[in-house]
Structures are given as structure tokens and as C-alpha cells.
Regions:
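An alpha-helical, amphipathic repeat domain used for nucleic-acid recognition
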Residues: 1-160
């Protein structure tokens, strides 16, 4: 038997303590259903109890994969990342592929690539092959598709 003042890390949370722990995690940041299950499982609690708790939290809208997906997409768009990089993040967070596709479909990827290219390299289009290749690699590294990269490098502002 462990002493009464043993560190809480050695105690296995159950019931109310497990719920309290889940709310503490969700209070700090958004978690996908699978991420929250994995995080709570690290404590050594019963997997059935964890699954039941996470389902209950999802039904009560405390946890939402949809909210997690939209937050991830918005966050990555602000960082200048393309569709492939964002898909990779959503997959890492165990977001349902149909939900991920719905979130990604709402974005104009060409406009994102153009804005990113202009922010990094300026409004003038590259004329030399070396500079075109450099900008093309930059956009590809950020996760934009080949067609989007080509279109972004060919796009010319009508105001000029």
C-alpha cells in the first residue's frame, strides 16, 4: 500500500479524478478524441472508462473533432502552410479524413500560395530559372500542390 502523501503520478485516476484531469487537459488546449484518449491512457486508467468519459465529453460538446480540425487548419494557414502539410497535421491528430477534407475544401489554395509568395519574395515575378526554381521549392516545402505552385508563379496582378 502506498503512503497517503505519495505523488499523484503513482495513483491511477478513476471516476471524478479522471473527469477532472480530462477537463484540465481540454482547458489548456483543444484535443481530438483519439489524442485525448491517448493522453488519459498515459495515466494508467481503465481504457473502457476513458472511452466512455471521452464519448460523454464529445456528446456534451466539451470535446469536438470538428473544432479541433478547424483550429488546426486556421493555425496552419496563419503559418503559411499548404494543403499537404495541413493534411499531414490532421492525420497526426487522428482527425476523420472526411472531416479533414471538408475543412480543407473551404480554402482558396491558389490565393494562399500567391499571398505567401508575395510576402516572401515580393510582387515581381521571377524571370530567371534559378529564382523560379527557388520560389517553386519554397512553395512545395510549405505543402502546396504542383499545379498551385505553377499557377502562383505565373500569376500577375492586374493593377501592374
Amino acid at each position: 500500500m502506498s503512503p497517503p502523501n505519495a505523488p499523484s503520478a503513482t495513483r491511477i485516476p478513476t471516476g471524478a479524478r479522471l473527469r477532472q484531469l480530462a477537463f484540465a487537459y481540454l482547458g489548456r488546449r483543444e484535443y481530438s478524441k483519439q489524442m485525448l484518449i491517448d493522453k488519459l491512457a498515459e495515466t494508467g486508467a481503465d481504457l473502457n472508462a476513458i472511452q466512455q468519459l471521452v464519448d460523454e465529453l464529445a456528446d456534451s460538446c466539451y470535446q469536438s473533432d470538428s473544432r479541433m480540425a478547424s483550429m488546426t487548419v486556421r493555425s496552419n494557414l496563419r503559418r503559411g502552410r499548404g494543403q499537404a502539410r495541413i493534411k499531414q497535421d490532421l492525420k497526426k491528430y487522428a482527425i476523420d479524413p472526411a472531416l479533414a477534407a471538408a475543412e480543407l475544401a473551404a480554402t482558396d489554395w491558389l490565393q494562399q500560395a500567391i499571398q505567401l509568395r508575395m510576402k516572401k519574395f515580393g510582387a515581381t515575378l521571377p524571370t530567371e530559372a534559378k529564382e523560379k526554381a527557388r520560389q517553386f521549392r519554397f512553395l512545395q516545402y510549405r505543402g502546396f500542390d504542383l499545379d498551385i505552385c505553377r499557377q502562383a508563379l505565373a500569376w500577375q496582378d492586374e493593377d501592374e
